[in-house]
Swiss-Prot record:
Cofactor annotation: Zn(2+)
Species this protein is from: Neisseria gonorrhoeae (strain ATCC 700825 / FA 1090)
Quaternary data: Monomer.
Residues of the signal peptide: none
Pfam family, one: tRNA-synt_1e
An example Gene Ontology CC term for this record: cytosol
Binding site for Zn(2+): C28, C209, H234, E238
GO molecular function: ATP binding; cysteine-tRNA ligase activity; zinc ion binding
Family affiliation: Belongs to the class-I aminoacyl-tRNA synthetase family.
Top-level division of the source organism's lineage: Bacteria
Name of the protein in question: Cysteine--tRNA ligase
Enzyme Commission numbers on file: 6.1.1.16
An example Gene Ontology biological process: cysteinyl-tRNA aminoacylation
Amino acid sequence: MTAIYNTLTRQKEPFAPIDPENVRMYVCGMTVYDYCHLGHARVMVVFDMIARWLRECGYPLTYVRNITDIDDKIIARAAENGETIGELNARFIQAMHEDADALGVLRPDIEPKATENIPQMIAMIETLIQNGKAYPAANGDVYYAVREFAAYGQLSGKSLDDLRAGERVEVDGFKRDPLDFVLWKAAKAGEPAWESPWGNGRPGWHIECSAMSENLFGDTFDIHGGGADLQFPHHENEIAQSVGASGHTCGHDHAQTHHGQSIASHVKYWLHNGFIRVDGEKMSKSLGNFFTIREVLKQYDPEVVRFFILRAHYRSPLNYSDAHLDDAKGALTRLYTTLKNTPAAEFDLSENANGYTRRFYAAMNDDFGTVEAVAVLFELAGEVNKTNDAHLAGCLKALGGIIGLLQRNPIEFLQGGAVSDGLSNEEIEDLIARRKQARADKNWAESDRIRDLLNEHKIILEDSAGGTTWRRG
């Protein structure tokens, strides 16, 4: 049985879906005003891995990852660029999909857009007002009254008083409490707006996910995921909105209380992936260590980046550096070299359990333990290297495939990747042919010169009785 660390209860719990025939997972997606960065890459890869594993375990999963296509940043960027919001959104949604495809991330089953769900958001806000959880302000905004939700702060583990003292809150004379957050923003000149009972305006960020998840999944569902930075306030606010509107919780006995109040959530399991740091520092544009996925993929093969992300446990901080990416590249190269030297036979995991498969499955069932699962892959590769057993090589490829690795032709991986060395495959093959002729002519100086030239471009040659093969270093 799969065990999942639940951020809400701060402990591992057996995964027991509300309806085993209809497992539902919602992940907060991207705000599409710029190219995706490494933090986005981690969210995409981590929850792709989780979706793949749940399906491997036989669960019929519906995976939803939303797109925020209306936001202050989107409005500002479109104005700055002199383009419409629709044009900006379309451009960066396409770029997001291209980045995800490159990283081997399967498309979610549903990708709802915020602007396609405005009526649902308005309806939820109306319900919150009727339930005494929200109030219209004199300026045309609508706010959530956090004091009216007794369990507020349960996800972050803080009381309202703790939050008021420790968090920077917006000073707003229209709020009843500084911690109250906006559900509906009154229209501003030149900004997109929709009609509502409170006047023209647009939704706040937090209500978007509550309304979209409720529209697709109903009042309760199994898994809600996202980056650790969303735990507070975004996910905290989602709970307040969703439970405040429906009055329904997931029915799970979380066996805990929050400052004297029973824990109440519409979601059974809350999952959060850890932060990405760059050379030990927080990734930020102000520090000049902010990297988009596209920038990284100019230097590294996309599968290397995916492998780098999966080598760390999803909840742990992940430290990005060239040294760590180079190490990941070398490690993945070793696995593909094994599959090059011993071509994989067909292997059916459902019919061929062995010690390696059992340990891999046990690792993944323990809160998606990719660190231990990847370690099993390397032990298995070591056995394949010793035995040249094509059946075991097939097992290696099949296990890697569960988490989206090792599915390419080994030669294509070893000779492919980001071509930052300046030599195309054709140029390399030509140099190798010239070196072969030089060796046949016993022109050792020319042969060495070509080898040195290839080494300068990080092209590694492997001479054997069957000829010369090569890979990018």
